[in-house]
Amino acid sequence: MSFVALIPARAASIRLPDKPLADIAGKPMVVRVAERAALSGASLVCVATDDTRVERAVTEHGFPAVRTLSSHPTGTDRLAEAVRILGLPGDAIVVNVQGDEPLIEPTLIDGVAQLLADNPQADIATCACPLTDAQALFNPNVVKVVCGNDGRALYFSRAPIPWARDALAGGERMLAPGLPAWHHIGLYAYRVSFLQRFPTLAQGELERFESLEQLRAMEHGHTIVVSRISAAPAAGVDTPADLDRVRAIYLQAPKTEANQGLIQVQSDQGNDGR
């Protein structure tokens, strides 16, 4: 199986300006993400950015980059432009690796790519881990997914789904025992043929209300398959505190990017379960 890892990277960030360029043990964060992705089975790791500084930082460290428009409404639209620039064939598989996840496990990248390759009826593959506390279940910033027995996504929501009617009848906010609640992890593998169609798909009501772009694919009849993993992966970088945590992990790790094992052990200690 062959696939491409694409890393969208925008410098604009409200909570952490110039986030892709933030230094982590001597290298920009986007380069650290690319190094992690390069440890996967990807045949190509490429950054898609609308920022000259990000492009220069990436290429100076030996990774290719493509310049994309700054006007894209979603990250998926940016991926669609990137695959067009790269000239990827419609049957190719692309994994969207978020540019703020310098602790991402290479095996997770391989896993979603393999899942899509194994499910020819699907256009998208992603992953989810068990929800383990009520606070996360009721947190609208934690996206939930419910799946069929075949692993196909039935719905994604910011609401607490599935709803435990009897356990929550009194208005309590609790995680009902045995509730099959899953936290969606925002790592996606796409078929290029789907990415080529995505910009032409009209936004539907579900996407507008939930503000979840994967619902656009589902509203238009596209199949998403979900790998259910046992535990949450290391959290990404959203705040200055997150950045400090990741910097500490890298500074404690051996001076080789191949030693992903130690980085993962350290990251597990700082995982906030998102």
From Swiss-Prot:
Descriptive protein name: 3-deoxy-manno-octulosonate cytidylyltransferase
GO cellular component: cytosol
Metabolic or biological pathway: Nucleotide-sugar biosynthesis; CMP-3-deoxy-D-manno-octulosonate biosynthesis; CMP-3-deoxy-D-manno-octulosonate from 3-deoxy-D-manno-octulosonate and CTP: step 1/1; Bacterial outer membrane biogenesis; lipopolysaccharide biosynthesis
SUPFAM superfamilies linked to this entry: Nucleotide-diphospho-sugar transferases
Protein task: Activates KDO (a required 8-carbon sugar) for incorporation into bacterial lipopolysaccharide in Gram-negative bacteria.
HAMAP family linked to this entry: KdsB
GO biological process, one term: CMP-keto-3-deoxy-D-manno-octulosonic acid biosynthetic process
Similarity comment text for this entry: Belongs to the KdsB family.
Catalytic activity: 3-deoxy-alpha-D-manno-oct-2-ulosonate + CTP = CMP-3-deoxy-beta-D-manno-octulosonate + diphosphate
Group of enzyme by EC: transferase
Keyword annotations from UniProtKB, A to Z: Cytoplasm, Lipopolysaccharide biosynthesis, Nucleotidyltransferase, Transferase
Localization: Cytoplasm
Family matches, as InterPro entries: Cytidylyl_trans, KdsB, Nucleotide-diphossugar_trans
GO molecular function, one term: 3-deoxy-manno-octulosonate cytidylyltransferase activity
EC number: 2.7.7.38
Source organism (scientific name): Bordetella avium (strain 197N)
